[in-house]
Amino acid sequence: MATFNPDKVKTVPANREITVRDLLSHSSGLQEGVVGFMQMLKDKKPRSSLEEEAKKYAGIPLGFQPGEGTGYSPIAGFDMLGLLIERVSGEKVGDFMKEKIFNPLGMKDTFFYPDTEEQNKRIVRVYKRKKDKLVDVTGGKDDIDSLLKRSNGYTACSGGLFSTVGDFDKFAKMLLWGGEYNGARILKEETVLLMATEAPKNHLEPDPGCVWGLGMKIRQNPKKANSFATEGTYGWSGAFGTHFFISPKDNLAAVFMTNRTDLNGSGSYISKEIERLVFGCFGEENKNV
């Protein structure tokens, strides 16, 4: 890896253009695999705008042909979705989300980057387990927010959203209840159904027994996935261990939050334990146990 040069990789033309579905289902190939990872590590420049990021991504070889593979692309893929929102709406993506999602749902404590003294006072610390104790790593190299603040010139859709359990619970319930919460219609029912349905035309499993919906990972085969969730459960996790999931079969939505840098996002052992406990109590298959 030390001698690997991503600039000398042999490339071939893409078979087709990348679609919105590709971006949402992590099947675009953008900034994915060894080449994408090495290019990301090489990039030390402060981020200035989504437009500038798009130009940068355009010069990075895809990890695979669009729609023919799967690879987690939370930075490039979701930044491009943010740029698309700005182009279509004519608004900054942060303002658009506040107007169309946060305010209608009453998510008053959800925002991209704290910009007031009161907000900064309420931000929780970031921790990492070192040996047998948790160490405060806020603001250090292990704190991804410090890295994301390279992007102060614009709202990075790949990260930087702050929220609370109460606020995010409203968002989760909106999805569980078919796109509507507390009288506010955010999404059509068919849109929510699409989010929770396998999206790529090719059957692509990012993990055994799991497939991508639109922005969501779906437990298609819980036994194969070694999961306690019921079939069709969907959701996603944050880099610091936040986790939410929705089980349409059980009429269940759950939100869990923590703030540690060593939990491996969606692979967190804590997230799996939370799922085991929740489905053990409320899951359809366990109601008669």
Regions found by a protein language model. Give the residues of each.
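Short, surface-exposed loop or secondary-structure junction motifs
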Residues: 1-231
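A short, flexible beta-alpha/helix-coil linker loop
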Residues: 63, 260-263
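Short, ordered coil/turn segments that flank beta-strands lining enzyme active or ligand-binding pockets
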Residues: 130, 248-249
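C-terminal helical cap and adjacent loop that interface with cofactors, partners, or active-site loops
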Residues: 169, 242, 277
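Short, gly/Ser/Thr-rich active-site loops of penicillin-recognizing serine hydrolases
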Residues: 177-181, 191, 196-202, 221, ...
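Short, structured beta-strand/loop micro-motifs enriched in basic residues and often containing a Trp
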Residues: 235
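Short, small/polar residue-rich loop motifs at catalytic or cofactor-binding pockets
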Residues: 238-240
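Short, well-ordered beta-strand elements
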Residues: 244-245, 251-260
